[in-house]
UniProtKB/Swiss-Prot annotation:
Gene source species: Pseudosoriculus fumidus (Taiwanese brown-toothed shrew)
Name assigned to this protein: NADH-ubiquinone oxidoreductase chain 5
Family of the protein in this entry: Belongs to the complex I subunit 5 family.
GO cellular component, one term: mitochondrial inner membrane
Coiled coil: none
Subunit structure: Core subunit of respiratory chain NADH dehydrogenase (Complex I) which is composed of 45 different subunits.
One annotated GO biological process: mitochondrial respiratory chain complex I assembly
A Pfam family hit: Proton_antipo_M
Function: Core subunit of the mitochondrial membrane respiratory chain NADH dehydrogenase (Complex I) which catalyzes electron transfer from NADH through the respiratory chain, using ubiquinone as an electron acceptor. Essential for the catalytic activity and assembly of complex I.
Superkingdom per UniProt: Eukaryota
Catalytic activity: a ubiquinone + NADH + 5 H(+)(in) = a ubiquinol + NAD(+) + 4 H(+)(out)
Class of this enzyme: translocase
InterPro entries from the UniProt entry: NADH_DH_su5_C, NADHpl_OxRdtase_5_subgr, ND/Mrp_TM, NU5C-like, Proton_antipo_N
Keyword terms of this UniProt record: Electron transport, Membrane, Mitochondrion, Mitochondrion inner membrane, NAD, Respiratory chain, Translocase, Transmembrane, Transmembrane helix, Transport, Ubiquinone
Length: 606
């Protein structure tokens, strides 16, 4: 082991200290959250050492010292892959989590189980680190399932609320569907490559098989909330705001995209798979951007913006630019975590009010929070020289100059414009105008835990994109030459979105109330997806099951075959018996006459 590998293992090992602390008496003290926050900050500074060594030397490493188990001919070891993706992502995730932990100390200060909440957040981070650094599919699957179960526990943190329990169940069930794809892909690789090591899979799988990649796409669709398996993401807003910030910035939702980036050596030679990923991403980014336009819950708007950005990352992988998608993951983490923390500050100060229509004029009451919210929204829209610009602008330029599906490109450009629209809508309703909240609310943001945590991410939202993009290793992007109008496409589309949003907001401010249009209903009801998936299908299934059990099983077996058949037989027998009037001589005589006539006829014939 050299300095490069040992310092990274040290920084990851430091994260387990607070988990071990939970076995001691420190876990019950009020200082436990402070210890967790401090240790994560130390882990971040330690992780900078191997990252800087890697940027300087460019040497990747694989740690494979610990043999785990052998199943027939498959040898499983604890493998850590220290490449470009894991080395850049680790300090980003640690930095963002450090800020979120400090924010949580302010946001969750009155929660009786705050120490357990911090332990859960930390385990969420640890499982994501396992996923990022894994070099075999089994280890990656442990991290994959780990982020899934921790998201379930954290989304359903306020388990006394029915909505929180439903949201947690939604998250775990939709991810279960994705996990089926992951397990099928693992089984396929085991049967065909006889290995779960990533290098061996890439070397042996030269047939360009679509089946395992479809499994991985299903897994990524579930985890990264792509169209079809997306409803759990807005529902996850029922969890506490720090959970939303961590979930959407650097942990669970980017795990699906990260999985596809890990397997890009297989995807880059498979054009069918690239087209599928491109179309899935384009549909997701447009649909969720449309859904964000008419939401009134500030957290749900930001959640849909996450889903839209994840769709943009899928589009980037679809045009065969995994390094660009990874760059967008890293830059997106800073301003998305900050946007959630700003919304958490507003919600907390307005006595848990999340409706943007009941805010307004917050620039005077919460100057620092609203300034950060404005910077975060501008970074999200790709404003030049903020963090989002360095990845988003490159993605749009690369898509414009690629041989790609024109419809997918058009949908992506429209979604980029809509990003500016819903970002402007948040700012217009919450920051500008007259206050529409209660005048008796005591608003105070002068808490160092709140200010310092947002301040760090604010600096990251301004400078991180520049720093990370300076240290990108050579990748597959060609030297792009394009006309000026193509170069300015991303900026023009964003400006169009801003102008459109402001014009619509100003035009509709003094209009009389009218009945919502069908397009508004479609967007507001999330494309009727939850109603169809969560109401229509379960109620139809329940009704059919009820009919099947009561009409078929109960009536047929319980009534017609056993009890009812006996009673019917007895009833018909009694009717037959009771119909006899007792005229036995007449019956015998008629029988005898019939017999004699029959015999005479036979004899006559003979």
């Amino acid at each position: 082991m050299n300095l490069f590998t040992s310092t990274l293992i040290l920084s990851l090992s430091m994260l387990t200290i607070p988990v071990l602390m939970s076995l001691s008496s420190i876990y019950k003290s009020t200082q436990y959250p402070y210890y967790v926050k401090t240790i994560i900050s130390y882990a971040f500074f330690t992780s900078l050492i191997p990252t800087l060594i890697f940027i300087n030397s460019g040497h990747e490493a694989i740690l494979s010292n610990w043999h785990w188990m052998t199943i027939q001919t498959v040898k499983l070891s604890l493998n850590f892959k220290l490449d470009y993706f894991s080395m850049i992502f680790t300090p980003v995730a640690l930095f963002v989590t450090w800020s979120i932990m400090e924010f949580s100390m302010w946001y969750m200060h009155s929660d009786p189980n705050m120490n357990r909440f911090f332990k859960y957040l930390l385990m969420f981070l640890i499982t994501m680190m396992i996923l990022v650094t894994a070099n075999n599919l089994f280890q990656l699957f442990i991290g994959w399932e780990g982020v899934g179960i921790m998201s379930f526990l954290l989304i359903g943190w306020w388990y006394g609320r029915a909505d929180a329990n439903t949201a947690a169940l939604q998250a775990i069930l939709y991810n279960r569907i994705g996990d089926i794809g992951f397990i099928l892909a693992m089984a396929w690789f085991l049967f065909n490559s006889n290995s779960w090591e990533l290098q061996q899979i890439f070397m042996l799988d030269t047939n360009q098989n679509l089946l395992p990649l479809l499994g991985l796409l299903l897994a990524a669709t579930g985890k990264s909330a792509q169209f079809g398996l997306h409803p759990w993401l807005p529902s996850a807003m029922e969890g506490p705001t720090p959970v939303s910030a961590l979930l959407h910035s650097s942990t669970m939702v980017v795990a699906g995209i990260f999985l596809l980036i890990r397997f890009y050596p297989l995807i880059e030679t498979n054009k069918t798979m690239q087209t599928l990923i491109l179309c899935m991403g384009a549909i997701t980014t447009l649909f969720t951007a449309i859904c964000a336009l008419t939401q009134n819950d500030i957290k749900k708007i930001i959640a849909f913006s996450t889903s839209s950005q994840l769709g943009l990352m899928m589009v980037t992988i679809g045009i065969n630019q995994p390094h660009l998608a990874f760059l967008h993951i890293c830059t997106h983490a800073f301003f998305k975590a900050m946007l959630f923390m700003c919304s958490g500050s507003i919600i907390h100060n307005l006595n848990d009010e999340q409706d943007i229509r009941k805010m307004g004029g917050l620039y005077n009451a919460l100057p620092f929070t609203t300034t950060s919210l404005i910077v975060g929204s501008l970074a999200l829209t790709g404003t030049p020289f903020l963090t989002g610009f360095y990845s988003k602008d490159l993605i749009i330029e690369t898509a414009n100059t690629s041989y790609t599906n024109a419809w997918a490109l058009l949908m992506t450009l429209i979604a980029t414009s809509l990003t500016a629209v819903y970002s402007t809508r948040i700012l217009y309703y919450s920051v500008l105008g007259q206050p529409r909240h209660s005048t008796l609310i005591l608003i105070n943001e002068n808490n160092p835990l709140l200010i310092n945590s947002i301040k760090r991410l604010l600096i990251g939202s301004i400078f991180a994109g520049f720093i990370i993009s300076l240290n990108i290793t050579p990748m597959t992007i060609p030297q792009m030459t394009m006309p000026t109008h193509l170069k300015l496409t991303a900026l023009i589309i964003t400006l169009t979105g801003f102008i459109l949003a402001l014009e619509i907001s100003l035009m509709t401010q003094n209009l009389k109330l009218s009945y919502p249009h069908n397009y508004h209903k479609f967007s507001n009801m999330l494309g009727y997806f939850p109603i169809i998936m969560h109401r229509l299908i379960p109620s139809t299934t329940l009704m059919m099951s009820q009919k099947f059990s009561s009409m078929l099983l109960d009536l047929t077996w319980m009534e017609n075959i056993l009890p009812k058949s006996i009673s019917n037989f007895q009833a018909s027998s009694s009717i037959m018996v009771s119909n006899q009037k007792g005229l036995i001589k007449l019956y015998f005589l008629s029988f005898l006459i019939t017999l004699i006539i029959t015999m005479l006829l036979f004899n006559f014939h003979a």
